[in-house]
Amino acid sequence: MTYSKISQAAHHLPEQVISNDDLSLILETNDQWISSRTGIKERRISRSENTSDLASRVAEKLLEKANIDATEIDFIIVATITGDSIMPSVAAKVQGTIGATHAFAFDMTAACSGFVFALAMADKLIRSASYQKGLVIGAEVLSKYLDWEDRSTAVLFGDGAGGVLVEACSEQHFMAESLHTDGSRGQNLTSGNNPLRSPFSDSEEASPFIKMDGRAIFDFAIRDVSKSIISLLEESSVTAEEIDYFLLHQANRRILDKMARKIGCPRDKFLENMMTYGNTSAASIPILLSESVEKGLILLDGSQKVLLSGFGGGLTWGSLIVKI
């Protein structure tokens, strides 16, 4: 039987760092207000790199780490809500940039859950025994979709990309999954990004800026996401104590604090980096994973169990338990 495993992780970030103090020069806010409410101290902002540029750099790093040629890649999935264009997809641009001539490529649009959804799909593709190697990347340039006069959103988000190489193997590594969507609550977190109005349409152009009902999203994460994680652990007969690390979407430190208490796990098992990068949507989990590998916390030798969980626009939420 064919299974899949995560064999490499990599990330890439824009060079420009924007601190809370920098934001206080253009917004009515300050470092204490931002950091006490979110845990965020700074974020990366792209000056010229598009989402496909960040994603392509991650793909190149993954190939370098694995010491393989791009022609060995069978598929590329990029999770993003900030594509360079409607078409071609970011994944197609990555495929062309790295020369993965044998790979099919497509984007996954599931906001902050996108990387988890994409990783679950990659597992199924490889388990079909039709494909051997795939790149799964989360990449965002959210700064282009922020109203820089709205402190409720401008202070939260950052740009970046991270990803993994998923390969076929003979032992099960993807142990359990739980994926959800509730479109009836979609208006709690939106970004218009509509094309120009046609001469045959009566609709007005929608604002491209990210809009969020912060309280509704906070409550959703604490209630629905925590419940789904607890259910996943119970259904898979894995205890919270058996999980070495929880890698959750990096939205807000208060969310992680409350979720750790609800799940009944030591807070230090919940890894975080939002203080440095802010909320990078689909990129947050793979960036965190890659950094954790670099720090020696995650070994990529199959000896650890980690729980990955994303949640955000859609509304969407999903979790995976993976031996890594």
UniProtKB/Swiss-Prot annotation:
Key words of the record:
Acyltransferase, Cytoplasm, Fatty acid biosynthesis, Fatty acid metabolism, Lipid biosynthesis, Lipid metabolism, Multifunctional enzyme, Transferase
Q: InterPro entries from the entry?
A: ACP_syn_III_C (IPR013747), ACP_syn_III_N (IPR013751), FabH (IPR004655), Thiolase-like (IPR016039)
In terms of Gene3D superfamilies, this protein maps to: 3.40.47.10
**What domain of life is recorded for the organism?**
Bacteria
MF terms in GO: 3-oxoacyl-[acyl-carrier-protein] synthase activity; beta-ketoacyl-acyl-carrier-protein synthase III activity
Which pathway does the protein contribute to? Lipid metabolism; fatty acid biosynthesis
The active site annotation covers C112, H249, N279
Q: Name one GO biological process term.
A: fatty acid biosynthetic process
This protein's GO cellular component annotations are: cytoplasm
Q: Which cysteines are joined by disulfide bonds?
A: none
| Enzyme Commission number, as recorded | 2.3.1.180
Which portions of the sequence form the region ACP-binding? 250-254
Places the protein is found:
Cytoplasm
Which residues fall in a compositionally biased region of kind Polar residues? 184-196
- Name the reaction it catalyses: malonyl-[ACP] + acetyl-CoA + H(+) = 3-oxobutanoyl-[ACP] + CO2 + CoA
Concerning HAMAP family, the annotation shows: FabH
This protein's assembly is summarised as: Homodimer.
* Described function: Catalyzes the condensation reaction of fatty acid synthesis by the addition to an acyl acceptor of two carbons from malonyl-ACP. Catalyzes the first condensation reaction which initiates fatty acid synthesis and may therefore play a role in governing the total rate of fatty acid production. Possesses both acetoacetyl-ACP synthase and acetyl transacylase activities. Its substrate specificity determines the biosynthesis of branched-chain and/or straight-chain of fatty acids.
Q: Which family does it belong to?
A: Belongs to the thiolase-like superfamily. FabH family.
Record remark on domains: The last Arg residue of the ACP-binding site is essential for the weak association between ACP/AcpP and FabH.
Q: What is this protein called?
A: Beta-ketoacyl-[acyl-carrier-protein] synthase III
